[in-house]
Amino acid sequence: MKKIDILSIGNITQDINIVGKKKYYSLGGTSFYAYKVSEKLGFDLGIISEVSNKIDYEKYIDIKKLIFQKTENHTIFENNYVSGLRYQKVINKPGKILVNNLSNSLASIIPKIVFYCPILNEIENKFFNLFDKSFKVCNLQGFVR
C-alpha cells in the first residue's frame, strides 16, 4: 500500500483560451491545479482522471502520479475573453470516471485526504464509499455545473 497526502478525483481538462485573435492551449481543471499547488508545497498528490492519447500529459505532470481511465476524447473547454468577460463552452464533455475501471489501482493507495473535484459531474457516486480512513473534501462547482 502506498500512502499519499492527497488524492484528487476529477478530470484534467484541455483549455483553449481565446484572447483577441490568438488561441492559447493549456491544461486545466481543479485536479490539475491541485497537483501544481501540492507540488510547490511539497505534498504528494495523486490524480484520478480520464485521459486520451491526444495530450502528452508527461510534459505537465509526473505520470506516476496519474491514475487514469482511458478515453477517446478528453474534456475540452473553450474560454473566449472579450472586453474583460469570459464566455465559456464545453467542446468535449467528460465520460463518467468509474470505480470498476480503476479498482486495482485504488486498492493500492491510502490517501490522507481525498479531494473530490469534478469538472462536469463525472465522478461515479461509488467513489464516496471508498477511503474510509481519509479526510474528504469537495469542490462543489463541478457537481452543480
Predicted features and spans:
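Conserved N-terminal subdomain of the carbohydrate kinase-like
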Residues: 3, 14-25, 40-117, 121-122, ...
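Histidine-anchored nucleotide/phosphate-binding helix
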Residues: 29-40
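Active-site metal-binding loops of divalent metal-dependent hydrolases
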Residues: 10-12, 30
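Conserved N-terminal Rossmann-fold NAD(P)-binding element of oxidoreductases
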Residues: 9, 139
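Short, acidic/turn-prone active-site loops that include or flank metal/cofactor-
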Residues: 30-31, 71-72, 140-143
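Short, catalytically relevant binding-site loops at active-site mouths
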Residues: 121-122, 143-145
